[in-house]
Amino acid sequence: GNFHEALNLASLWKLPVVYIIENNLYGMSVPLSCSTCTPAIATRGAAYNIPFDIVDGMDVLAVRAAVAKAIEHARSGAGPYLLEFQTYRWYGHSRSDPRAYRTKEEEADWKARDPIPNFAALLVAEGVATEEEIDAIEAKVKGEIQVATDFALSSSLPPAEELELYVYAPSSWTDADVAREKALRERVRNGGPGVKKARYWEALRDAMREEMLRDPQVFLMGEDIGLYGGAYGATRGLFEEFGKERVRDTPISEATIGGSAVGAAMCGMRPVAEIMYVDFTPLAMDQVANQGAKNRYMFGGKTKVPMVIRTEGGAGRGIAAHHSQSLEALWTHFPGIYVVMPSTPYDAKGLLKAAIRDDNPVMFIEH
């Protein structure tokens, strides 16, 4: 699934990622023994050449040492590291969870290993802190939690007028820009001197090339976009010009393509990710629709996700049941993402350049 795709890509690209698994022994109610065929989850890292450690998550010093080791590894350029902390979930999955799937004796055994009082006792025993200092720290933390709780409970609900306030990042286009674009469109449609003729894929390639030259944060990623030049030739020559760091071939892993694009965009880059057919975009539904499209809204407008998913759909050539659907309407149901489906080379180039510069996720469907 997505976890395996992510591990594979991180190891393949030697990304400085530390993956942390908090193994609390249960899903919602199903125990690990009934849902996972191995006693530990971190062993999956071996399949992707990722070093891993399985750590007692109730031991503060063991956790600290493991994290320090993993971070040093990632920062050295050696690639990702996988940590599994074996811990416990004190409470049920939700307020309505009666915890009937485990015994009180099991809960008591794990409660005896509670790292907070145990570590505090260790600090006192080793002479690192006094009981008074521990009590002061505990009181300070409880006070901070109480302040946050009081703030949440006393805050009024946002007014209905703000319902759509943070759905989309604001556009930088002015009325003058729109008027100029309208005049230019008419001149191009009428043809004549100075109007370049280009095929659809050439217009797309020119748009990406120009934006990559203009902004070093723009990069391409996706299936067969490198030396092959893309399934329909739209990235032809860009690998040779910009190199493998900015034109990145990926495995056939649509979920990870979408998720990586969301993450890169949140960190200030402007990814242009290619998913070969719109039929395959539902494989990235969680990453693009649940994370990318909702991110700005959920964080009160404090983030932006400037990313483009390029894909192919619509009529033209019938390529069987799994490669020929028209799913543009599906993506229009998600607030926070723009859907673009240009019909002419002129529209394709202009809209792709605008999509790359926009601070919102864009599903860009070509034909």
Task: Provide a role label for each language-model segment.
Residues G1-V147, F151-S154, T332-H367:
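Glycine-rich ThDP/TPP pyrophosphate-binding loop and its adjacent helix/strand module
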Residues V18-I20, P80-L82, H93, R102, ...:
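Alpha-helical protein-protein interaction elements
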Residues Y26-S29, L61-A62, R89-H93, P159, ...:
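Flexible loop/turn segments at secondary-structure boundaries
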Residues S94, T103, A112, E161, ...:
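Short linear sequence motifs
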Residues L153-E161:
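Hydrophobic alpha-helical membrane-spanning segments
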